[in-house]
Each structure stands twice: as structure tokens, then as C-alpha cells.
Amino acid sequence: MKSILFTFTLIFAVAGLPLQAVSATKLAKPNIIVILTDDLGWADLGAQGIQKDIRTPNLDALAAGGLRATSGYVTAPQCVPSRAGLLSGRSQSRFGVESNGDTLEGFDAQQTIAVRLKQAGYATGMTGKWHLGPPGKIVTHGFDDVYCNQGAAGQAWANFDLDGKTIKGAEIASPVYHLDANSAAACAFIKRHKDQPFFFYLAYRAPHVPLDATRKYLDRFPGPMPERRRQCLAMMSAVDDGVGQVMDTLRQTGLEEKTLIFFMGDNGAPLKITKEDAPGGGPGWDGSLNAPMNGEKGMLSEGGIREPWLTYWKGRIPAGQVYEHPVISLDVAATAVALAGLDRGHHAPRDGNSADLTRSVRTTLDGVNLIPFFTGENKAAPHDALYWRWVAQAAIREGQWKLLVGGPRSYLFNLETDAAEKNNLLAQHPEIAQRLRAKLETWAAELQPPGINVKPMAKTWEEYFDFYLDGKAPAPPDSANAGAKRKGKAKGKAAARPDGADE
């Protein structure tokens, strides 16, 4: 194990080695903020340099002052499993949360980042979209301060208000636009806990449908464009304003150099193949874009799981970095645990109560501490390989090579020369594909349930693979679905898919 001396002492661990618990008296623990967006496409951050219409100056400033990862991944191409993986630091397929419709019992048995950091004396809080069970249960997952407004417009489940005052946990009327409320809640939490280390999860429901930007933000994007695109740009502008407010609050409280910030999305944009500009802002394309990545939400192609990723820690992570080695959202928990001086794998109570030993669970993390890599101390790649399983799909990335399996189909891509996954090299390099599949099968044998896939490919995903990976024209909708779609339009919104792709 190596130690690094900064302005205050932090003890890290070389990736893969166990982290020993460190006395709080010997460790100045940094604050940690995780900012998560919802259904954000690869192209929709100004710092990515892809789309000229997106304007995110505050997020771009984080990229300029810190690190932008060009191969930053999430654990699933759908909201619930991706969030379960991020917050637990373990592949959600290990505990049976494979997709949005699955039971959450497996997640309920995990230690979240918040539970772990409470053991190290951290204040913990969250705001925004939870999507991992009823809002009233969030406190049982280690988050003491909650302002959750993922449900009905103008409503929130909260136990503190936007002035930072403690209230009885209950459904309340939220006084402002939900994205503005998230930003205000984050700032209130920072001020409330400025004198102790804290962990805050800022989970904006943007640009996920329903598309509901206020006029304040819509007016920033005049001119002809698809209305769903305008809504996406406006909602992301609200997020960006909020990030600016959070940074201002950190500076005003003298905490900027003591705070590590992660920013990413939960999965790629749902393009619905055709990017239809359906009226009403309901289920369908959210206006976001994945270009030049191939595919979309609901696929283990790059367009479904490679996300904009920023990491900022002033004075610790060198500014202006473009980091090319693959990293994954699982690494957030491992990094946080390392910085808090905790062990990355042990038997511990799920709810952080040391007296409640009957609720202990196996808690070994799947990620690695990224700080030695992001500071430049460790020049190697953080991971030998990254692995995914999502329902009927599985994938492995090892270096530049990626093997993608969807039902009976297999694809091999060289992401170094073909990040857009346009050229299937399976026939040219069968030996590489066989080796990667063997590694993938070994990993998948540890999952719950074991195996490369859980169920057959649904029709929706077959159509997505046909279009994005096999170059076939999209199939015309059947008469029943077309009728439902027309009916949905008549009500001012697109019809939802029956397989949960819109969730």
C-alpha cells in the first residue's frame, strides 16, 4: 500500500489491494458529491465538443479544471440497475437487480456508499430521482437528509427543506421547478454540514421524460429545432445552472479544495431509433443525442453505456486532463471508501448500525480507487477488463477490444479505431472473441442467476440490434402498436413501449 502526502493526509490503496480501516484522527476526509443525470446522451455536454447547440458552461468549467474521461461507463443501459450498481459499488447482476421491473430485495440487502461513509463519520444526503423503492425508505439506505422529488410534479418526500431546516419526513409541496429544487437542496445541505465531512448524491431527473423545462430555460434556445431537442437543451441548462450554484456554495464555505465531485449520466439517450418529435413531452425520445456512439438506452452498445464523465478535485486532480483508460461507475464507491479510510470488503451491518449484526451482508466492492490513476501516480489502466450483463445482453471490454453478445448474436469491435461500433470483426479475429467470451462466461458464473443472459431477447431489443448493429431498416409498427401510438399522440404524448424501455 502506498501513501500520498497532500495538504492534508489521505491514505489510498493500489487498485486490487484491500484497504485497511484508518483512524479518523489520522485522516482528513474529503467531501464527496456525486452528480447524476438521467438518460443523458454521449453528445450532450459542451466539453465533449460534439454538439454546438448544447450550452453547459459550468460543467465545462469542471472539465477544464479537472478530468474528463473519454471511456467512462455505467453498469447498465437502464435507470434502476444502473443506479443500483452506482450506489452499491457492486455489479447489480450479483444481487438480482437486472432491469427496471425486477424486485429490489437484492438492492435492499446491499450497503450503499452512504451506509459505508456514515461509518466513517460522514453526513449523508440526497436529492432528486431515487427509483430504487419508495422515497420513505431512502433513509434506510444510509441517507439521513432526503429531498426526493422524483414523483408527481410539485411534490417531494423530504425531511429537510430548501432552507436547510429539519422537518418531519413526509410528502410536501415543492415550491419550485424540480431541477431548481434539487440544486437548492444540494446547496442547503452543504451549508448545513459545512463543518463535517459529507457525502451528497445529486440525482437530477433530466433530460428524462416527461420533458418539462420552464420558460426561463426554454427561452435560452430560440430558433427552429425539434421541440424535444429544445426541451433537452433547456433541462440540461437548468442542471448546469445548478452545478454553478453548488460550486459557488462550495467556494463561499471554503470547501472547494476539500470536495471531490463526480459527474455522469445513468445510461444513454433513448432515441427510439427514429428520434420522433412527438408532442407533449411524454414517453419517447428525450431530445438527447448519443452521436457518434452507436445504439441507445436499452443496449450494451456504446450508445447505451458510455456516458459523459467528469471528475473534479481542485488541487488534487490535475486540471485539463482527458483520461482515456476505461473506468466505470462502480469505481465511485471504491474511491469514496478508500478516501474515508474504510475497508473495501468486509462483513458489516447494512444500515450502518454496528449493534445490528444480524443484518450483516457480504460487501466486497467491484470497483477500484481511481485517485492514484487520476492524479497520475499510477500510470496503468485501472481495470484489466470491464464486464456487463443486462437481461439478454452481455459484454466485456478488455483494452481496445469489446465483445458484445445479444441473444444468439455476437459482435467484436476494436474501440480504439471504431468507437462507433460499425465494423464487426468477429470473423477476422475469432481467437480474440473466443478468449473474451471465456472471460465473460467465467465472470457471469458468479452472478444471480448465473449465465451470460437471463432471458431471451425481447422484440424491442431485437429491433434495436437489427437497426444499429446489423444495418437493417427499422421495422414498421404493427397495427396495434400504431393505433396505440396515434391514441397517445391525440392526448399530447407518445405511447409507452410495453417492455419498460421508456422508464
Where are these regions (language model features)?
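Formylglycine-dependent sulfatase
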Residues: 2, 6-10, 21-410, 417-438, ...
